[in-house]
Amino acid sequence: MDLQHQTFHNKGCDIHYWHKSSSSADYVIFLHGAGCDHRMFASQLPIFGESYNVLLWDARGHGLSKLQHNQTFSFEDMIDDFLKLCEKYQIANAILIGQSMGGNLAQEILFRKPNLVSKLILIDCTRNTGKLTLSEKLMLKLSKPIFYCYPWQTLIRQSAEACGNDEAVKAYVRNCLAQMKKKDFIDVMMSLMTCLREDEAYRFPKPVLLLCGEDDRSGNIRKIVAPWADSDANCTLLMIEKAGHNANQDNPTAVNKAIASFLTTP
């Protein structure tokens, strides 16, 4: 796929993104997970061929989209980046595909701007509006000091092990994280918590495909994904075998088949 590498500036950061135009008015936008970059979706691009305009980015603080010295990652700034990108291309409606952090961002966009989204595909991410247990709330409060207790190289290695089953996926995650500073990674993880708000009555107003690796060991994702799907008539869940947290990289064949099928449903 012929992707054009471009940038735009917003809130003190040069955001790098990749764009493919088509004759169609339909857009698909890929949103990667924390610590990763746009390359994680390489195996999903062939699904869309010439039928869609495609956008991928390196979110602020990730990949080529470097934060300036003493600048702190903000989930709210990332939302603003996304909306600026949509404004730039006059996108009125898009399919959002988000993995982990990207899935949290996609949920937040649907919550704030429902008319901007036609469908969501959420890969290995938690529910923004889910109810947390007391132990989960405690772990969130303790996570920052726990992260700082770990040497950065240990944190990189353990994060990579948690993300993938496949050795190539683990190597990719290590490569991505090695380009970040420890403080920046922790800032990202802490800022993600700002999108969590308990609202058990909330239901998605658009069709949503939930994909979860059967071996996902990240947070509460594997535990909550089935009850999440059961509670929302607009959600379709598929567990991906032989896949961890980065299910789209561990088992792209199964993920691509699920996405292609979902795209054809009303």
Task: Give the label of every model feature segment.
Residues K131-T133, C149-R203:
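Conserved alpha/beta-hydrolase catalytic His-Asp/Glu region
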Residues M1-I29, S51-Y52, A92, A260-P266:
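Alpha/beta-hydrolase fold catalytic core
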Residues Q107-F111, S118-F147:
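Flexible "cap/lid" loop of the alpha/beta hydrolase fold
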